[in-house]
Regions:
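Acidic, glycine-rich flexible loop segments
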Residues: 62-98
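Intrinsically disordered, compositionally biased low-complexity regions
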Residues: 151-153
Length: 382
């Protein structure tokens, strides 16, 4: 037996100063890749990994840009008579752009990891098995600290405010496939069968507080203004699929496939959908009766196909079949009004929601003349 392999590694660093103040960005990128073959290339394995670390500041928002474009240039940037030191204008409801960008400290950090690995084995001659796995992990953090300021008619902040947030995204996908490819005589056949599964998970946590003690940049102080929230979303998808392709002498072409997908977006009894497709083609220029024109026609092919597609995407809604119930509706009990005690339905979703189906019929013509000097493709869809 023999063994061969190849690998590579790289690292890059980026430090970019923003055009405007407090918009710097810094990132590291690491890439690793390797492939190995064993048993005279009957067994191959490989992996690739990308790690990206980034951090930066992002203090520019709509108010800052309006301030840069419209704030009067005759107003001084600094004003020693102002308690917070920034020049203001009483005639325009816009912030001093430099002052506004300096009193708000907005930082972001992110870590992203992408990992892919595969194994391919030739079980017997012409029959191959392949396993793929992909993993992605994202983690981001954001922090916005707003200091004390007095920016005239735009507003003032007598005590610091703080917002912090973090989010994670975890995703994995696995795929198993069997491929059989065989050529015998003028016959060419290719078979594929496979199974795949994937899962995505999003989690976010956010907190904020206002009027916190100066110089203590943590979520402490005024408990009456402290707030926190979190969110969690999960999505799973499983698929079975198969395909057969056949051609005879590259004259008569046939292909058929089917896949069955199941999505966690839909309720029990409506999670699965089947999506077939079939196509046929005829290369007329390869027929014997076409030989007198072979110096003129490079290709004359007619084809027809039918396919059924499924769509599970409903915006960013991972739970479209779950109704949302809230509270806060007032009602009368005896002579007393009970405020916000009665539950009510915010949104009612259909329980029989399922895959969106689209069917397409197609006929087409491919034409090539005079060694490719003139080509034409025509398609009609129903």
């Amino acid at each position: 037996s023999s063994k061969t392999g190849a690998y590579s590694a790289s690292i890059s660093y980026l430090n970019k100063e923003g055009i405007l103040r407090n918009t710097d960005h810094e990132s590291y990128n690491i890439r690793l890749k390797s492939d190995y073959s064993f048993l005279n290339n009957r067994l191959t394995i490989g992996q690739s990994m990308i790690v990206r670390l980034a951090q930066g500041k992002g203090n520019i928002d709509q108010d800052t840009m309006f301030g840069i474009l419209q704030f009067p240039s005759v107003v001084p940037v600094y004003d020693p008579t102002n308690a917070t030191g920034w020049g203001t204008s009483a005639n325009i409801n816009l912030p001093n752009p430099l002052g506004y960008s300096n009193v708000i400290d907005n930082t972001n950090e992110s870590t992203r990891i992408f990992l892919n690995a595969y194994l391919q084995a030739e079980i017997i001659k012409d029959l191959k098995y392949k396993f793929n796995v992909g993993i992605r992990k994202d983690h981001t953090k954001s922090r916005t600290y707003t200091g004390i300021y007095d920016l005239g008619t735009f507003g003032k902040n007598d005590a610091p405010d703080l917002k912090e947030g973090s989010s994670t995204y975890d995703s994995w996908v696995i795929e198993n496939t069997l491929n059989y490819d065989k050529v015998f005589g003028k016959h060419n056949i290719s078979l594929l069968a496979g199974y795949s599964a994937q899962k995505d998970k999003h989690y976010g946590l956010n907190g904020s507080n206002s009027d916190i003690p100066q110089f203590i940049e943590t979520m402490t102080g005024n408990t009456t203004t402290m707030s926190a929230s979190s969110n969690l979303k999960e999505l799973a998808l499983v698929s079975l699929f198969g395909r057969v392709m056949y051609s005879y002498d590259d004259r008569y072409l046939f292909s058929a496939s089917i896949r069955r997908d199941g999505s966690s977006r839909f309720g029990k009894g409506h999670q699965y959908g089947s999506f077939p497709s079939v196509s046929v083609g005829w290369n007329i220029n390869r027929e014997k009766f076409f030989n007198p024109l072979e110096n003129v026609f490079d290709q004359l092919k007619i084809r027809a196909s039918y396919g059924k597609l499924g769509n599970q995407e409903i915006g960013d809604n991972y739970y479209p079949t779950i109704s949302v119930v809230g509270s806060g509706m007032n009602y009368l009990q005896g002579n007393n009004i009970w405020f916000g005690q009665m539950p009510y339905v915010n949104a009612v979703s259909p329980t029989n929601l399922t895959w969106e189906n689209t069917e397409t019929y197609n006929i087409g013509l491919d034409l090539s003349l005079l060694n490719g000097r003139l080509t034409m493709t025509a398609d009609a869809y129903v």
